[in-house]
Amino acid sequence: PTIKQAQTDMTPKYEDLRAYYTKPSFEFEKQFGFMLKPWTTVRFMNVIPNRFIYKIALVGKDEKKYKDGPYDNIDVFIVLEDNKYQLKKYSVGGITKTNSKKVNHKVELSITKKDNQGMISRDVSEYMITKEEISLKELDFKLRKQLIEKHNLYGNMGSGTIVIKMKNGGKYTFELHKKLQEHRMADVIDGTNIDNIEVN
């Protein structure tokens, strides 16, 4: 299968995806995470880099993983979400352990596209992983942002998949026609065990 190119006039669904995946993202290393008393159905962790307070919604696996805290030596990958919980600065998932050593792990990124005439093109490049532990949120967001900037994702193509293939034979798939599900934003994988990444 190859990425199918969408019509020039994007549907509102793709406009929303383009708007989300071109938002600014923030990365903070070696943080302390403080737990907040629950006031809604979702619990939150506070991180306070640079005197700003960011609240991170604990969803999916994070809900059981983070109990009372505080937690030190955590990295956070933050994309500010719409104001769903009466909060101005909140993000979902993206919490990982700080590296114990330097990581420079290069993997092959292969992009296969099919244009309106049915011509198939393939682009192969290197993608650098710098984390021992990386969240699906960070991988999904950075890869889609790169696809938007370099390959006009959501401009002339709107469907397809990103597949993260692991050395042990496992794989993780992101479907390009929808935003990554919130519970998966908390999923964390071994960055050094990524074998290659395919987009098609």
Q: What do the predicted segments below correspond to?
A:
Residues 174-192, 196-200:
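Short, exposed beta-strand-loop hairpins at the edges of beta-sheets
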Residues 32-62, 98-170:
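Mature extracytoplasmic domains of secretory-pathway proteins
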